């Protein structure tokens, strides 16, 4: 892996860990902030809302070097994670999580452009997948480590370490990432012209619905494993490693398959796998074997679609809208996360905390993603 891509992957690691670690430490933060588990799910939603708002940075940063934008995003991540580590009440943690989410979509939009620009010809999707790999490694190692720290010491330590990592990443980005020219300045309106076509909207809606469905379940994976799977709290970090391994494998397979096959079809396949997994959460009897298997499968599906969807949108935005297009995927992804967390929490409240229903609540939403991507593939990729 090129050092420049490694530096970008380090940033992706921070943002991935900051976003997903909350799923593993939700019970501890709920206890510390004196709120219920469904109410603590709002910490996930706050991050996701920050992602959506933070993309506005790109609208006004279009004339800035992408490298300098990456440094800015890491500085914001440093502030957000520091505040999360020292939060003493629920409103403060909500604000801290919002700030932590601000750089997320903008980072991935910018980093995707850099990775694509620095890639060897014909290996653009693999280069993007290597950058995104930082996020998948965060899920395989960072999230379980954070969960373990929360069990053994304090959930605050996880955010403190992420803040220190953000500072280190600023240094390696300065040293290793080459400066590339800003994208063509198409003006504020020009950056959004790609959204006048239906294709990008099909992709974005698919990302939104696909992740809404998955996060109905994933937002509550830690208590699901314990309450329905019978796993002890000390085993949850190991199961987070299993989920992260699924994400890493999914990211690698998705990147390679996208370069060899059609990106839209690859993304449709990934959401189909997630749909099957969510149905099985509801249908299969809960025991150690089934919960572990489903944790791996749905984790695999979650990052199988990252590279194809990210690449499709950056290509759709060519001509001045690449940064906004790349960030738009993360907006849809995280807006989906926020809605999924809320829907999953509502399902739990309505069923007296029956965690099986997080799967059946998410399945029909994921089905919409499959339908949208099949439509996209037939309309745009069948001609290729």
What does each model-found stretch correspond to?
Residues 34, 86-92, 230, 284-286:
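Helix-breaking motifs and short loop linkers at transmembrane-helix boundaries and internal kinks
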Residues 90-92, 121-177, 220-224:
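Helix-loop-helix hairpin linking two adjacent transmembrane segments in secondary transporters
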Residues 96-134:
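Cytoplasmic helix-loop-helix junction between adjacent transmembrane helices
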Residues 316-353, 362:
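A late C-terminal transmembrane helix in Major Facilitator Superfamily
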């Amino acid at each position: 892996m090129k050092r420049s891509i490694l530096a970008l992957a380090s940033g992706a690691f921070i943002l991935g860990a900051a976003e997903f670690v909350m799923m593993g430490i939700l019970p501890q933060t709920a206890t510390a902030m004196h709120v219920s588990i469904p109410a603590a799910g709002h910490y996930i939603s706050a991050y996701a809302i920050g992602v959506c708002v933070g993309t506005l940075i790109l609208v006004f940063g279009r004339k800035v070097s992408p490298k300098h934008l990456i440094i800015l995003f890491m500085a914001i991540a440093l502030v957000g994670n520091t505040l999360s580590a020292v939060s003493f009440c629920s409103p403060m943690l909500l604000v801290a999580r919002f700030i932590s989410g601000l750089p997320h979509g903008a980072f991935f939009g910018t980093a995707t452009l850099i990775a694509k620009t620095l890639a060897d010809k014909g290996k653009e999707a693999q280069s993007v997948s290597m950058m995104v790999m930082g996020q998948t490694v965060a899920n395989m190692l960072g999230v379980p480590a954070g969960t373990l720290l929360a069990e053994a010491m304090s959930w605050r330590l996880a955010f403190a370490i992420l803040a220190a990592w953000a500072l280190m990443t600023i240094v390696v980005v300065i040293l290793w990432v080459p400066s590339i020219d800003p994208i063509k300045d198409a003006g504020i309106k020009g950056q959004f012209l790609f959204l006048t076509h239906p294709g990008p909207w099909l992709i974005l809606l698919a990302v939104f619905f696909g992740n809404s469905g998955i996060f109905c379940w994933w937002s509550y994976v830690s208590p699901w494993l314990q309450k329905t799977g019978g796993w002890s709290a000390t085993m949850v970090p190991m199961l987070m490693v299993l989920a992260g391994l699924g994400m890493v494998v999914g990211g690698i397979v998705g990147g390679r398959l996208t370069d060899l096959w059609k990106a839209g079809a690859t993304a449709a396949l990934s959401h189909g796998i997630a749909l099957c997994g969510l149905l099985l959460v509801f249908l299969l009897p809960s025991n150690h074997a089934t919960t572990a298997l489903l944790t791996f499968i749905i984790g695999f599906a979650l990052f199988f679609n990252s590279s194809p969807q990210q690449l499709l949108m950056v290509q759709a935005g060519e001509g001045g809208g690449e940064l906004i297009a790349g960030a738009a995927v993360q907006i849809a992804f995280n807006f989906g996360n926020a809605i999924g967390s809320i829907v999953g929490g509502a399902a739990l409240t309505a069923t007296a905390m029956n965690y099986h229903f997080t799967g059946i609540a998410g399945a029909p939403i994921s089905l919409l993603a499959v339908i949208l991507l099949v439509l996209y593939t037939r309309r745009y990729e069948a001609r290729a």
